[in-house]
Amino acid sequence: MRKIEEQMNMAIRSRKNWSGSNTTVRCFKENGVTTEVNVLLHGNCIAWFDTASNDFNISSAGWETVTTKSRLNAILEEFAPDRRVFQKNWQ
């Protein structure tokens, strides 16, 4: 896992806003409590976490690049270790 992805995961876990290079973690609060955490790559939301239910969703946001898959796999490694994103035959 890349250093930037380790920092991204740390920000998600600690529910802190963070930005590094092309990746941003944005936390949304309601009444002082973090309710949602979004991960953006080049300004496109690729993951969002509901902190109340501990559910999360991922998306390539239409950009099926090596970097997008790397960020998504770093998130999955941390929060759903039995899952992976991969591409076969460009699909």
Please identify what each model-predicted range represents.
Residues 1-91:
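Terminal leader/tail segments of proteins
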